[in-house]
C-alpha cells in the first residue's frame, strides 16, 4: 500500500455497492417485518 492518499476505483465501487445493497436489504426486511413504518 504505497499509494495511501489515492483510493482505487474498484474499492470505492465495492464499498459503495455493499453499502447500497445492505441498506436495500435492511429496508426490504424492515418493511416486510413491519418495522419499516417506524422509519
Swiss-Prot record:
It is a single-pass membrane protein. InterPro entries: PSII_PsbJ, PSII_PsbJ_sf. Belongs to the PsbJ family. It is found in: Plastid, Chloroplast thylakoid membrane. This is Photosystem II reaction center protein J. The chain crosses the membrane at residues 9-29. GO terms for cellular component: chloroplast thylakoid membrane; photosystem II reaction center.
Amino acid at each position: 500500500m504505497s499509494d495511501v492518499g489515492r483510493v482505487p476505483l474498484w474499492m470505492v465501487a465495492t464499498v459503495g455497492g455493499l453499502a447500497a445493497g445492505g441498506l436495500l436489504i435492511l429496508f426490504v426486511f424492515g418493511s416486510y417485518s413491519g418495522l419499516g413504518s417506524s422509519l
